[in-house]
């Protein structure tokens, strides 16, 4: 199991603002800094740490190194209490004079920001796929409930208001599924850059999953709000999909900048 250590208390959406350092010392690098909200922290065996090797160069002075769980100088914070995705562990990763061999450097010094962006570009369609699966589960739960739940002597599925909610849910899911598959096929074709497409494959499906899970709770009414039913958990889990791997506002920034470049070239 591995973990990707990028986020810091002052470096969330602004990945270039990281403060963690990796200083070359002979045949080793000495790492110092704290990474925040790291999935699998304390459980993973390997940690890809994004740190500054040359502060003066800005993002070109960022490098990526591998730290192992048992290396001296690495420790972990408390297990965070989260709104959702409670099945995964989230902790701080603390590096205090953590010394690692120079061959733990990924690629060359200064390539860390590129490693980070490529990692996120590849991870974002995965978040979209998670969103599609989560939303499909919420629809299945809501539709099954609507068939069984009776009000005014008939199943609530027979009410047009409920049918419209379910129809919108199903349509949004299929649209998001098609987008995720299309982007996956595009990435498999080997394009030089797919930053825009990766952002799209995260943005639309994750916004969709949030809406669909909220609507699933609405279809189920008071039952949906209770912890005995899974849709309230699905709604809580859906929220993080709009936040991690780059917030959906950042996704819109990425898409907008890419479109601006594309249409500038067409003039």
Question: PLM features: residue spans?
Answer:
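Alpha-helical interface subdomain recognition
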Residues: 12-15, 24-29, 92-97, 108-111, ...
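A short core secondary-structure module
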Residues: 16, 28, 32-76
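Short, surface-exposed charged micro-motifs
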Residues: 19-21
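Flexible, small-/acidic-enriched active-site or ligand-binding loops
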Residues: 72-99
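Short, charged, solvent-exposed linker or helix-capping segments at domain edges/interfaces
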Residues: 61, 75-78, 101-109, 267
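Short Gly/Pro-enriched turn/cap motifs at secondary-structure boundaries
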Residues: 10-13, 37-40, 54-56, 82-89, ...
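Basic, amphipathic alpha-helical recognition segments used for DNA target recognition
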Residues: 67-72, 102-103, 136
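A short, Trp-centered hydrophobic/proline-enriched beta-strand micro-motif
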Residues: 1-6
């Amino acid at each position: 199991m591995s973990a990707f250590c990028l986020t810091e208390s002052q470096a969330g959406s602004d990945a270039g603002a990281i403060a963690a350092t990796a200083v070359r010392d002979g045949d080793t690098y000495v790492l110092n800094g704290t990474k925040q909200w790291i999935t699998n922290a304390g459980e993973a065996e390997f940690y890809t740490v994004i740190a500054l090797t040359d502060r003066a160069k800005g993002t070109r002075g960022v490098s990526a190194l591998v730290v192992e769980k048992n290396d001296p100088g690495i420790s972990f914070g408390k297990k965070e209490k989260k709104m959702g995705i409670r099945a995964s562990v989230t902790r701080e990763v603390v590096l205090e004079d953590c010394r690692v061999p120079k061959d733990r450097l990924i690629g060359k010094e200064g390539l860390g920001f590129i490693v980070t962006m490529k990692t996120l570009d590849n991870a974002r369609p995965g978040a979209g796929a998670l969103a599609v699966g989560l939303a499909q589960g919420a629809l299945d739960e809501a539709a099954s409930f609507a068939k069984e739940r009776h009000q005014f002597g008939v199943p609530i599925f027979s009410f047009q208001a409920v049918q419209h909610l379910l129809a919108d849910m199903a349509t949004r899911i299929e649209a998001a599924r098609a987008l995720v598959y299309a982007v996956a096929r595009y990435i498999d074709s080997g394009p030089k850059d797919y930053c825009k497409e990766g952002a799209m494959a995260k943005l639309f499906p994750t916004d969709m999953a949030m809406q669909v899970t909220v609507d699933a709770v609405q279809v189920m009414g008071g039952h949906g709000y209770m912890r005995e039913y899974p849709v309230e958990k699905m709604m809580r889990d859906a929220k993080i999909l709009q936040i991690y791997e780059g917030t959906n506002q950042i996704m819109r920034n990425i898409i907008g900048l890419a479109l601006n470049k594309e249409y500038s070239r067409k003039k």
